[in-house]
Amino acid sequence: MSYRKLGRTSSQRKAMLRDITTDLIINERIVTTEARAKEVRSTVEKMITLGKRGDLHARRQAATFVRNEVASVREEDESIVVESALQKLFNDLGPRFAERQGGYTRILKTEPRRGDAAPMVVIEFVK
């Protein structure tokens, strides 16, 4: 099994990948280093595939990985509706990519980070 260590212990690496995956699901576009983006791409693709399946088992599998964070708050008929990242994954992103067979994200290179010249990229969902 090959993966990037990203200069962290295994628990730190898993936590970081969960955080970045959840942030990408919520914001649909984030700026990060190239190595992190390449590593998180595989986890995001797996989460979108679970979102496309949409059954109870897929929801439970995704819930073990995606953090329970608020994705959006809106007002409908005098009531406040709070949507979590998991709900966004299954209600918005899953149906959006229903016809697409993989390749849900793209990585675009940007200028290097100012402090240490690390290669920076934008990872986003394909429309």
UniProtKB/Swiss-Prot annotation:
Keyword Ribosomal protein on entry: yes
PROSITE patterns: RIBOSOMAL_L17
Domain of life: Bacteria
GO MF annotation list: structural constituent of ribosome
GO cellular component: cytosolic large ribosomal subunit
Keywords (A to Z) from UniProt: Ribonucleoprotein, Ribosomal protein
Entry's Gene Ontology BP terms: translation
Entry-linked Gene3D superfamilies: Ribosomal protein L17
SUPFAM superfamilies: Prokaryotic ribosomal protein L17
HAMAP family documented for this protein: Ribosomal_bL17 (MF_01368)
Subunit structure, interactors included: Part of the 50S ribosomal subunit. Contacts protein L32.
UniProt family annotation: Belongs to the bacterial ribosomal protein bL17 family.
Protein's name according to its UniProt entry: Large ribosomal subunit protein bL17
